[in-house]
Amino acid sequence: MEEKKALIIVDVQKAFDDKKWGERNNVKAEENISKILELWREKGWTVIYIQHTSDKPHSLFHPKNEGFAIKEIVKPMDEEVIITKTVNSSFIGTNLEEFLKLNEITTVVITGLTTPHCVSTTTRMSGNLGFDTYLISDATAAFGMRDQNDTYYDAATIHNISLATLHDEFATILTTDQLINDFIKTH
């Protein structure tokens, strides 16, 4: 029997277009997610959207603010699942794990924003919960950040270090092309 798969699209929301986040890497991440999404839908495999929400009225992620909306380039279809979350992990305080298990999904492919935060936390938990987890390196992105000593790390460095901490221990890291050629087209 073929293993059931789910594509998880984490927090691809308009809030991340705000200039407050600063410099970003992988400007084509959403384009790559869209490519994967199109092929995933053709296969009839499960698509799950994760949408971050905040109860703080001034937050970009508050449901009344435009930033809460999922970006048009990866717009969900009516029958696709949207799970809202309030913390970094897509598994905490949501029914994601239950949904995956009820639908006998054992393999998950994770994409979305941002690599060091919600994508990383979701990937770690997915791996810890025993799912066969894949993270798509060019279908995620990071912003530059400062550490506790005010040292600045550019977006590419943050992204690459985040991927390095996940590689092999929590997930298999693939590019969009690798996923399409070695995973989607062979299943």
Swiss-Prot record:
Similarity comment: Belongs to the isochorismatase family.
Molecular functions (GO terms): hydrolase activity
* Listed EC numbers: 3.-.-.-
Highest rank taxon of the organism: Bacteria
Q: What is the protein's name according to its record?
A: Uncharacterized isochorismatase family protein YrdC
> Which segments of the protein form a coiled coil according to its record?
none
Recorded hits in SUPFAM superfamilies, A to Z, give: Isochorismatase-like hydrolases
Q: Which UniProt keywords apply?
A: Hydrolase
- Respond yes or no to whether keyword RNA-binding is given for this record: no
Q: Which Gene3D superfamilies match?
A: Isochorismatase-like (3.40.50.850)
Under the heading InterPro entries, the entry gives: Isochorismatase-like_dom, Isochorismatase-like_hydrls, Isochorismatase-like_sf
Give the enzyme's main class according to its UniProt record, as a single word: hydrolase
The organism's lineage is: Bacteria, Bacillati, Bacillota, Bacilli, Bacillales
Return the Pfam families for the record.
Answer: Isochorismatase
